[in-house]
């Protein structure tokens, strides 16, 4: 019985790991707002790597009831993996507390283009800062 449970756990974990997409940080130059492609322009309160935003990320996840403080103790990169279902490199750029910038709208924080948006802009993954002309 125990060997069946162990085998199932191993296969399930391997399947999860193989099916989880990886997010990679962009290395090309910062785009202008016209080069965001199909992504929208977001105005984010905090922008930085998962490692540099560890404290605000932990607070946001706990405040919004997405995870318990026990899970946050595992580390912010693991939390993003569990909550978003996306494997995040510690150096990928994230945007926190973001909202879409309307055409002609203004932003009092950092404007970015992001590849993945989760929880109505609470966490955006794969962001690139926009040079405003």
Curated annotation (Swiss-Prot):
Keywords of this entry: Cell wall, Disulfide bond, Secreted, Signal
UniProt subunit comment: Self-assembles to form functional amyloid fibrils called rodlets. Self-assembly into fibrillar rodlets occurs spontaneously at hydrophobic:hydrophilic interfaces and the rodlets further associate laterally to form amphipathic monolayers.
Subcellular locations according to the entry: Secreted; Secreted, Cell wall
Role: Aerial growth, conidiation, and dispersal of filamentous fungi in the environment rely upon a capability of their secreting small amphipathic proteins called hydrophobins (HPBs) with low sequence identity. Class I can self-assemble into an outermost layer of rodlet bundles on aerial cell surfaces, conferring cellular hydrophobicity that supports fungal growth, development and dispersal; whereas Class II form highly ordered films at water-air interfaces through intermolecular interactions but contribute nothing to the rodlet structure.
GO CC annotations, alphabetized: extracellular region; fungal-type cell wall
The family this protein is said to belong to: Belongs to the fungal hydrophobin family.
Signal peptide positions on this chain: 1-25
Organism placement in taxonomy: Eukaryota, Fungi, Dikarya, Basidiomycota, Agaricomycotina
Coiled-coil zones: none
Source species: Pleurotus ostreatus (strain PC15)
CDD domains linked to this entry: hydrophobin_I
Tagged with keyword Secreted: yes
Protein name: Unclassified hydrophobin 14
GO molecular function term, any single one: structural constituent of cell wall
Disulfide bonds: 36-113, 43-107, 44-98, 114-127
């Amino acid at each position: 019985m125990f060997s069946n449970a162990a085998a199932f756990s191993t296969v399930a974990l391997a399947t999860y790991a193989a099916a989880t997409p990886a997010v990679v940080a962009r290395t090309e130059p910062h785009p202008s707002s016209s080069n965001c492609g199909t992504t929208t322009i977001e105005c984010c309160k905090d922008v930085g790597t998962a490692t540099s935003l560890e404290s605000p990320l932990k607070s946001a996840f706990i405040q919004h009831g997405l995870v318990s403080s026990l899970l946050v103790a595992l580390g912010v990169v693991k939390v993003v993996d569990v909550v978003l279902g996306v494997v995040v490199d510690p150096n990928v750029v994230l945007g926190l507390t973001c909202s879409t910038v309307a055409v002609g709208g203004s932003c009092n924080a950092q404007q970015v283009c992001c590849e993945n948006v989760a929880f109505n802009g609470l966490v955006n993954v794969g962001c690139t800062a926009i040079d405003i002309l």
